[in-house]
Structures are given as structure tokens and as C-alpha cells.
């Protein structure tokens, strides 16, 4: 920045190796095992960087075009609040969408990589890469 202050780092990140080591597993405990947010929280807790409860998450910087650091916790937000739609760990942005580590229960998908496509006009907050932001605590 021109005023001599350090650039703002958006979101909380872990090394991607922390996410990779759980590939193929359903993360979380009890009734939350397999839920998307539980997977993200699990990786961050085991890396020593807990994200806190989802009700405390705040919307940060838009991921698409945001030059986000790999390993950053991201989620879809509505009106600045996390509404339990979807959370993931950012890997990279491609022309087609956001490559992430995630999991979900319906349909059942273990922790793994997938693409959240940039879907113009689609309001599916769980699958549209245009609707994701960094998670701020």
C-alpha cells in the first residue's frame, strides 16, 4: 500500500497439505460429521487455527477475482451472514470456477476436491463460485 501500511490479508488460511491429508474421509463429529462447515472447521482446528462457531463467521472479501491465498476458508454468505449454505477451503481460481476442498451430506460426498463453477444468474448458494467470500472471524 502506498501509505506504508502492510497489505490487508483476507481470511484465515492453512497450508493445503492440512486439507489434503483428510482426502476421502468424512470429517466432523456426531450428527455434524460430513457437513461442509464441519469439514472446514476440522481441518483448521487440527492445524491449530480454529475458526470458531459458524454463527460468528463474518463475510470477508469476494473470492472471484480477489487474489485469495490457497488454503483460505471460504463460504457463501447472504446479506453478510453465513446461512449454512456451503463452506470450503480454497485451492485456486480457474476460468471456469473455484477449485476447493469440501464435503457434504446431500448427496453424500467425502472430503475431496471439486470445482464450484461460475454460474451466471444461478442463485444456488452451495454450488455457484460467484457467491463465495473469505471467512472472517
Q: What are the language-model segments listed below?
A:
Residues 1-86, 92:
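Secreted/periplasmic proteins that engage bacterial cell-wall peptidoglycan
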Residues 6-10, 24-27, 91-137:
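Aromatic- and glycine-rich peptidoglycan recognition patches
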Amino acid at each position: 500500500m502506498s501509505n506504508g501500511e502492510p497489505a490487508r490479508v483476507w481470511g484465515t488460511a492453512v497450508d493445503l497439505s492440512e486439507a489434503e491429508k483428510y482426502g476421502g474421509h468424512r470429517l466432523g463429529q456426531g450428527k455434524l460429521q460430513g457437513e461442509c462447515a464441519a469439514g472446514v472447521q476440522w481441518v483448521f482446528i487440527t492445524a491449530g487455527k480454529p475458526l470458531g462457531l459458524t454463527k460468528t463467521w463474518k463475510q470477508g472479501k469476494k473470492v472471484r477475482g480477489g487474489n485469495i491465498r490457497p488454503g483460505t476458508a471460504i463460504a457463501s454468505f447472504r446479506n453478510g451472514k453465513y446461512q449454512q449454505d456451503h463452506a470450503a477451503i480454497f485451492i485456486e481460481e480457474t476460468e471456469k470456477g473455484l477449485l476447493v476442498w469440501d464435503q457434504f451430506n446431500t448427496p453424500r460426498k467425502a472430503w475431496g476436491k471439486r470445482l464450484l463453477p461460475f454460474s451466471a444468474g444461478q442463485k444456488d448458494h452451495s454450488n455457484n463460485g460467484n457467491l463465495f467470500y473469505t471467512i472472517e472471524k
